[in-house]
């Protein structure tokens, strides 16, 4: 019997170092340099030849599945197998009613804002301008709950100044939105019924531009992070750097900052704006008030940032990247929205994320850089850009298809994939091969999030959305047993299990905006909360479940079994 270490088309015979009742153990030492090492193993037993790579034992050689070792690449130890909890702040808990967005405070996407008075009301189909009042004080008030649940990391959806409740259209990267922070100076008027221009929304302008409100909000956020750290929890922020919002002070399409003290003219307002090159304009003859700018996917509410044409913009965003992970905030990392879309060329995209990683790790070496990405992330996971990704392809999708037969938006049902263990393992192995071990150990493993239907709704195996089937249908025919099975997989699979707020309380919902319902305080499913707490406890007590490798044990009709191993620790 012989075992070979195969690297760069060279075979090196390995030395048998140990034998026990079950296995023979072989080793081989290799001197690393600065280059990535890709390798696999060849095993000869009598007349039988086979190979071992990320798929396990196999009969063929495929470079895609080779093991990868990147010298010097490490991901934060605290994130390996950590339990994340995603908070969509407006819908979590209202701890300070004085900062609530008011009805008629300003105009947003064709209509005026609405303050929702009934916390238990479900979001409207166009719920982007509805505000429930959840805020950072509410998170502080519920810290005991999060700690008792076993949360290791709080992941916040965007918190920076923004006119929407989702806040993926950032208005000011330097400050936490006072509507989720603190409003200490509150003057001005609401919009009158016949007013539709936000330059007259003096109450809103005062709230989001007055430095007293902005600085007090940043101070409150620093307190939230400090409190989380005192309880042994980490905090990561959502960074939206591919685009900003049309309300942004650099663009100022709403003319909010045009006459506000201490602010420059926005690029929409004036051609000589210092922010002109932050955006790409198609018609240089439309100033003042030039709306001919590039929007992400054509959305004029989401101006695309034009990094390649502005060193000042690049420098500023890299400053923001450093600012929030350094003192006094000391955030523990970034989740990066639509990260692969940033810039206008693949070359610039990779250049930027290398710079982003460099400045973040210089400011806080233990910070995580985690990207939203659909498709293979392999090109970005080479040790000098992202640490990891939201794990759609190698977790959310295979688990959803196997247990429910549903697509993650509830847009399709596939009977041939439900309970199909071979398809499950094939997807997990194929997409998991895009990760090195350090990246896989910290991958964000979600069942639900703000962009997809709630997993509990998917268990009803019903194709639909809010506009087609209505709210009630999201809760009809749901299967708690299937959801428990999903949570069990989530808490035992390699990576960082991530709970979307309210999933643990039995929340249902179609894809957005219905998946952004308010947390049902006082109406929680206590059995589901206890089950999450129980499974999280198992996850945290068994080292193999936090950091161990995974091996397929069984694949059958509606049946999967797997083992996790980490040194002397094993689990099945």
Please annotate each region the language model reported.
Residues 81-82, 147-154, 229-236, 330-334, ...:
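Loop/turn elements at helix/coil->beta-strand transitions in domains of secreted/extracellular proteins
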Residues 89-91, 154-166, 238-248, 337-342, ...:
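Short, solvent-exposed turn/loop segments enriched in Gly/Ser/Thr/Pro and often Arg
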Residues 87, 146, 156, 173, ...:
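Conserved, mostly hydrophobic/aromatic
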Residues 520-553, 568:
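Aromatic- and carboxylate-lined catalytic core of secreted/periplasmic carbohydrate-active enzymes
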Residues 89-152, 159-328, 356, 362, ...:
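Substrate-binding/active-site clefts of carbohydrate-active enzymes
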Residues 2-6:
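Beta-strand signatures of extracellular beta-sandwich domains
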Residues 77, 247-252, 321-322, 328-330, ...:
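Conserved alpha/beta catalytic core and glycan-binding cleft of carbohydrate-active enzymes
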Residues 9-86, 93-112, 118:
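The feature marks proteins involved in alpha-glucan
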């Amino acid at each position: 019997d012989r075992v070979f270490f195969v690297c760069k088309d060279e075979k090196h015979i390995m030395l048998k170092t140990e034998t026990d009742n079950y296995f023979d153990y072989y080793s081989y030492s290799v001197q690393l340099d600065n280059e990535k090492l890709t390798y696999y193993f060849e095993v000869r037993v009598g007349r039988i030849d086979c190979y071992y790579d990320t798929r396990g034992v196999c009969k063929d050689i495929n470079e895609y599945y080779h093991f990868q070792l990147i010298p010097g690449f490490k991901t934060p130890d605290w994130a390996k197998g950590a339990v994340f909890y995603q908070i969509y702040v407006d819908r979590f808990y209202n701890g300070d009613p004085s900062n609530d967005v008011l009805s008629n405070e300003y105009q947003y996407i064709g209509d005026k804002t609405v303050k929702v008075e009934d916390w238990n009301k479900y979001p409207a189909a166009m719920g982007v301008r509805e505000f429930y009042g959840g805020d950072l004080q509410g998170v502080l008030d519920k810290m005991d709950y999060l700690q008792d649940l076993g949360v290791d990391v709080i992941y916040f959806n965007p918190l920076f100044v923004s006119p929407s409740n989702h806040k993926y259209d950032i208005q000011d990267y330097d400050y936490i939105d006072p509507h989720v922070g603190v409003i200490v100076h509150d003057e001005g008027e609401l919009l009158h019924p016949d007013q539709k221009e936000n330059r007259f929304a003096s109450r809103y302008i005062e709230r989001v531009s007055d430095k007293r409100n902005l600085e007090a909000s940043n101070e409150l956020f620093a307190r939230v992070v400090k409190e989380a750290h005192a309880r042994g929890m980490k905090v990561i922020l959502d960074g939206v750097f591919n685009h900003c919002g049309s309300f942004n002070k650099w663009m100022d399409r709403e003319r909010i900052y045009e006459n506000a003290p201490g602010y420059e003219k926005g690029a929409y307002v004036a051609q000589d704006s210092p922010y002109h090159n932050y955006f790409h304009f198609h018609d240089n003859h439309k100033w003042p008030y030039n709306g001919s700018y590039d929007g992400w996917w054509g959305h004029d509410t989401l101006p695309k940032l034009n990094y390649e044409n502005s060193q000042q913009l690049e420098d500023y965003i890299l400053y923001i990247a450093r600012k929030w992970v350094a003192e006094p905030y000391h955030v523990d990392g970034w989740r990066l929205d639509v990260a692969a879309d940033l810039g206008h060329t693949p070359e610039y995209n990779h250049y930027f994320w290398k710079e982003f990683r460099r400045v973040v790790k210089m400011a806080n070496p233990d910070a995580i850089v985690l990207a939203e990405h659909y498709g293979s992330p392999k090109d970005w996971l080479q040790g000098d850009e992202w640490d990891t990704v939201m794990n759609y392809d190698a977790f959310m999708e295979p688990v959803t298809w196997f247990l429910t037969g549903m697509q993650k938006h509830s847009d399709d049902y596939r009977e041939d994939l439900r309970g199909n263990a071979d398809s499950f393992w094939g997807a997990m192995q194929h997409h998991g091969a895009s990760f090195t071990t350090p990246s896989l150990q910290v991958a964000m493993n979600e069942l639900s999030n703000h962009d997809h239907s709630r997993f509990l709704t998917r268990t009803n195996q019903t194709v639909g959305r809010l506009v087609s089937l209505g709210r009630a249908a999201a809760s009809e025919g749901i299967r708690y047993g299937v959801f428990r099975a999903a949570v069990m997989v989530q808490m035992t699979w390699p990576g960082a299990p991530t709970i979307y707020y309210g999933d643990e309380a039995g929340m249902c919902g179609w894809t957005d905006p219905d998946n952004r319902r308010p947390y049902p305080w006082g109406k929680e499913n206590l059995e589901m909360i206890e089950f999450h707490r129980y499974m999280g406890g198992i996850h945290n007590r068994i080292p193999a479940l936090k950091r161990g490798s995974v091996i397929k044990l069984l694949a059958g009709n509606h049946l999967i079994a797997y083992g996790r191993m980490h040194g002397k620790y094993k689990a099945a």
